[in-house]
């Protein structure tokens, strides 16, 4: 749905909606998961609903991402321009996430404190997107 939506209204608004809604929902959703999962009779329905809340920002980011990245760069540099930052981010951000989440949880004595790491990254990405991400919908892919 989000890829289709980005074809209709633009890549930038859908991506920014995903980043901002992700930053706003990560902490409350995990607090809810902690609460509903620790009840004597865990509320499975609420747990599923809360997990689905996180799917919306993810879909808003990944849906248009595959169209946005190629549209940002000319054909002669596209492969390197897309692959290099994508894989560096996957390695550095994705690779460091378990360590950072665990370290923050231990450092502050709260297992949910580690969620400030992905929340902070989403806030940073939102600011960068607001300042620098152009609208690329309908941009020709030829040089």
Q: Residue spans of the language-model regions?
A:
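Hydrophobic/aromatic and small-residue hotspots that mark the transmembrane alpha-helices
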Residues: 2-6, 97, 101, 133
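Membrane-helix boundary and inter-helical linker elements of multi-pass secondary transporters
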Residues: 7-8, 71, 106-108
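Cytoplasmic membrane-interface "Motif A"-like loop-to-helix N-cap segments
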Residues: 8-19
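C-terminal ends and interior cores of transmembrane alpha-helices
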Residues: 20-40
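Multi-pass alpha-helical transporter architecture, strongest
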Residues: 29-32, 68, 120-143
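Hydrophobic core of transmembrane alpha-helices in multi-pass small-molecule transporters
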Residues: 41-61
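Intracellular juxtamembrane helix-capping segments at the cytosolic ends
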Residues: 60-73
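A late C-terminal transmembrane helix in Major Facilitator Superfamily
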Residues: 76-108
């Amino acid at each position: 749905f989000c890829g289709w939506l980005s074809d209709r209204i633009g890549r930038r608004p859908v991506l920014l909606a995903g980043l901002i809604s992700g930053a706003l929902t990560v902490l409350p959703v995990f607090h809810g998961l902690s609460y509903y999962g620790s009840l004597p009779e865990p509320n499975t329905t609420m747990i599923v609903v809360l997990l689905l809340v996180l799917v919306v920002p993810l879909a808003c980011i990944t849906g248009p991402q595959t169209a946005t990245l190629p549209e940002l760069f000319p054909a002669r540099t596209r492969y390197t321009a897309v692959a290099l930052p994508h894989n560096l981010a996957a390695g550095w951000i994705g690779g460091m996430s378990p360590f950072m989440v665990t370290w923050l949880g231990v450092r502050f004595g709260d297992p949910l404190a580690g969620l400030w790491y992905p929340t902070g990254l989403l806030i940073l990405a939102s600011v960068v997107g607001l300042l620098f991400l152009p609208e690329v919908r309908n941009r020709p892919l030829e040089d």
